[in-house]
Structure formats: structure tokens, C-alpha cells
């Protein structure tokens, strides 16, 4: 339960929330949950209901992992908890769902730490460019001391870290040219998430970062509003970006962790035995999601190589990208302080 430890004053959290914008916190009342599995629905007789909202499609590793979560919770609670899954942005954007989870109108919200960092600056450290060499290193770090420190303040704003998952290592696409060096990025208008670290990194590379909701991205690429975007391999395929992007460069510039938050008051209202059921189910779902990601990334990359011009980055050119984005580390340290950055450097060192 260390992941739930509070580390900062509530006043600081209020300031963080003030930066979250004016998104309306709504949960669509007539959204239909995805049944997810063949397990019998228990909501009619259950003592508790956990609604889980996320933005991804039903065939993604994350949704499949939440099907596992649903099955584990309903089975091991003997039907005392029913789980309803709401994929595909049916309850709104990531930010809207995190806010709904904070307010208690949604029990569990899943999204990227990149978006949740708008609520808690410490989570920004997980978005640093070229932070991890590969998924194995990233998973070890976010499920260790670094991930614990990054999410420790969430309890001050009414959330708890149920579990980390992942969107994965991100790569760059565009319709102008292959990207081999930082010079190739200059002048490109790249859609980014609404995340200052991502935007700063692309600015350092000479691009024009353009934050945009994921739901608007495909149309923006079709219309040429932006030149390119960046996503994990499996998500490129499931979102059909090969239909609107010509070049895929395996830059590996960010690792995007996913995080499932649970409303603190709701979790603490559960009897201790059911708290354990929920936490254990989240652990099982996380490991399942990592496995699904590995499988999907392999098959998706093979498919994308038949649809796009794909290039790898040489070690020498990779270092050029690392050097070009190094100033972002100083920017983040000024935001979060040296203590958590020391944990970042220890995680990088392995």
C-alpha cells in the first residue's frame, strides 16, 4: 500500500488542480458498458459496482487487460463487486474521466500518466525523453521506487494508484520525410498530447508541437492540419494511422506509462477483504496487459512494414536525439525538485 502514501501538502495539490483547465466533468448516463467476457453479469445482486472508463478500442491490450480485471474481481469477490467497462472514450476524454474519478462519479479511470501529470507534476518525470532503453527497463522502474514516488501525491486529490500499465514506447510518423536525425524533425508540425514535457522535447528538436485530442487526430492527419504524430507501435495499427501517414521512424523518444486511478473514498469504503480482491485483480491485469502489448507490438510492426516506409535509428543518431532533448531534464527538475530526479537517475542507471 506504499503507492498510496502522501508526500505533499494539500495546498500544493490545489494549485496543481487549478492548472487542469475547465473541462466539464461528466459521465455519459446512457453509455452502454462493454460486457467484456462470458462471465455472468453480477450488477443486479452486487453490493458494489466499479465502473471503469478509458479511451481505447476493445481490441487493444489495455481493454483486454480490463476484461481480465473484471473477471478476477467478480470471481474472487463471489459476485459482491460488479465491474462495468466503458471503452472507446464513451465516458469522455482521459482528462474528463480522471476528473470524474476524482469527483467520485467514476470509480476507475484509465489513461496516460502524461495526462494525469496535469493533476500532479511529479508524474512528469515518467515523460522525460529517452528515459528508458526498452519496455523491460520501463516496467521495472514504474513498478518500483520511481513509479511509487511519481504517484505518491495522488491521495491528496482524492485518487489512488490502482496500477500502472502502459501505452508503450512511442515512435514518430509523418508525411514529409523519413526521420533519421534531429535535423529531419525541424519544421514538422507534430501532434502531441496535451503535455508540456512532450511539447518541450519536440520544440528542442525544432518541430512545431501541436497538442490535440486523440479523437480529433485521424481527421487532422487526413486534412493535413498536422504533418505527423507519434504513438506506440500497437496503437498505430489499431488506430489505422498507416492509412494517413507515410513514414514511420523508430525513434523511441518517449515511454508512455498508463495508470488506472481509483477514487480514494470509494476504495476506502470497501471492506478490507474486497480491497485486497481489487488490488490483486489489478496486479493480474497489469501483467496480462504487458503480455498483450508484447504480442501486439511484434505483429503490428510486421504489418506496418508492409504499409509504411519504416526506418530504424542508428546508435550514433540516437545519441544526437538524446543530446538535443537533454535541456528538458533541467526544465523538469525545476518543476519537481532534485529528490525525485535523483530517483530518476538511479532508475536510468539500472
Map each language-model feature to its residues:
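Positively charged n-region of N-terminal signal peptides that target proteins for export
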Residues: 1-4, 9
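C-terminal motif of bacterial Sec signal peptides marking the signal peptidase cleavage site
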Residues: 16-19
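N-terminal secretory/targeting leader peptides
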Residues: 21-31, 42-137, 146, 154-350
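Conserved glycine-rich "GG(E/T)P / GGGxP" loop and the immediately following alpha-helix
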Residues: 151
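Glycine-rich, low-complexity intrinsically disordered segments
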Residues: 38-40
Amino acid at each position: 500500500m506504499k503507492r498510496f502514501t502522501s508526500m505533499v501538502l494539500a495546498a500544493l495539490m490545489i494549485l496543481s488542480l487549478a492548472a487542469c483547465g475547465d473541462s466539464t466533468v461528466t459521465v455519459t448516463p446512457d453509455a452502454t458498458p462493454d460486457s467484456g467476457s462470458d462471465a455472468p453479469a453480477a450488477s443486479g445482486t452486487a453490493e458494489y459496482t466499479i465502473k471503469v472508463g478509458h479511451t481505447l478500442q476493445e481490441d487493444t491490450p489495455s481493454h483486454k487487460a480490463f476484461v481480465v480485471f473484471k473477471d478476477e474481481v467478480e470471481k474472487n469477490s463471489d459476485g459482491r463487486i460488479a465491474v462495468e467497462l466503458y471503452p472507446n472514450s464513451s465516458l469522455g476524454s482521459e482528462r474528463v474521466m480522471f476528473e470524474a474519478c476524482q469527483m467520485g462519479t467514476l470509480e476507475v479511470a484509465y489513461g496516460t500518466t502524461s495526462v494525469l501529470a496535469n493533476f500532479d507534476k511529479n508524474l512528469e518525470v515518467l515523460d522525460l525523453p529517452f528515459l528508458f532503453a526498452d519496455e523491460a527497463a520501463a516496467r521495472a522502474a514504474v513498478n518500483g521506487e520511481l513509479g511509487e514516488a511519481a504517484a505518491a501525491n495522488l491521495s491528496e486529490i482524492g485518487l489512488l494508484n490502482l496500477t500502472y500499465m502502459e501505452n508503450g514506447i512511442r515512435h514518430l510518423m509523418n508525411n514529409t520525410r523519413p526521420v533519421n536525425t534531429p535535423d529531419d524533425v525541424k519544421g514538422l508540425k507534430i501532434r502531441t498530447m496535451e503535455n508540456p514535457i512532450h511539447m518541450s522535447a519536440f520544440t528542442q528538436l525544432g518541430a512545431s508541437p501541436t497538442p490535440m485530442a486523440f479523437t480529433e487526430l485521424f481527421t487532422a492527419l487526413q486534412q493535413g492540419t498536422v504533418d505527423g504524430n507519434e504513438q506506440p507501435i500497437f496503437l498505430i495499427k489499431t488506430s489505422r494511422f498507416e492509412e494517413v501517414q507515410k513514414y514511420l521512424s523508430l525513434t523511441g523518444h518517449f515511454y508512455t506509462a498508463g495508470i488506472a486511478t481509483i477514487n480514494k473514498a470509494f476504495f476506502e469504503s470497501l471492506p478490507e477483504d474486497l480491497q485486497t480482491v481489487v488490488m490483486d485483480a489489478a496486479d493480474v491485469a497489469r501483467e496480462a496487459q504487458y503480455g498483450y502489448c508484447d504480442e501486439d507490438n511484434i505483429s503490428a510492426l510486421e504489418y506496418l512494414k508492409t504499409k509504411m516506409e519504416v526506418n530504424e535509428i542508428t546508435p550514433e543518431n540516437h545519441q544526437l536525439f538524446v543530446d538535443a532533448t537533454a535541456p528538458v531534464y533541467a526544465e523538469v527538475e525545476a518543476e519537481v525538485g532534485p529528490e525525485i530526479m535523483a530517483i530518476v537517475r538511479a532508475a536510468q542507471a539500472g
